[in-house]
Amino acid sequence: MKILTLKARIPVALFLILLSGSAAVAQAPSTGTPTAINTAFVKLFGAVGSFTAKVDTQVLDPYQKEVVRLLMDFATFEGKVRIEINLAQMQSKDLPPSKIAELKESGMERIISLFRPDKKVTYVVYPGIQSYQTLPLAKADNDAFEKGLKLEKTALGKETLDGHDCVKYKVVVKDTNGPVLQAVTWNAADLKDFPLQIEMKEKINTVRMHFTQLRFTKPDPQQFDVPAAYGLMK
């Protein structure tokens, strides 16, 4: 296994920061995980229990100019979430070509995040070096998974997205103490009311997640487990 330098780890931190915006950890630190995919975020998908999709994810500044952009492979199964990205394909001024070269050399450009509320952890997996990290979920997120959350939607209007008639909603996810996540979603009636697009505020920025190549099929359950041959990263 290759020894990872601090420089090689920096883009990984950037990835985690990006995901922290995508699940609105800034809004709800009590329910956030280090990779930010949490029970409140999963609640946005409503009754859709299993699916796979590609996700075009953007971070926009207050002037709606793109700061970061990357594609994700996204899958859910029985409350579990799997996200896979390749940092070498991410567009960001904070990731120059020299950093991409370091990532490829270290074998850490490909990252898989496995949100496992049933095990009360998120696994961050690095297939290139056959290693993984274990990140415990916050107590509040465990409570949300066990006790459930309430989703409230307010219609803002109707728009067409990718040829699908969508209702644009303001969505608030609440636990017993109040709101834990707020978002704007575009839900397609002909796709089981699936949110084809999700926007959330991350401090002064906006995170936009646009879902494409959507398939309502059950992914292979083994995709949500760390391969047995992989070692725990020290």
Label each PLM-derived region with a short phrase:
Residues 32-36, 65-68, 144-155, 209:
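A short, amphipathic edge element
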Residues 46-56, 78-83, 162-170, 192-198:
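Short, hydrophobic/aromatic-rich segments at coil-to-beta transitions
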Residues 60-66, 89-96, 174-181:
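Short, cysteine-centered beta-strand-loop-beta hairpins and adjacent loop/turn segments enriched
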Residues 157, 162-230:
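Gly/Pro-enriched, hydrophobic low-complexity segments
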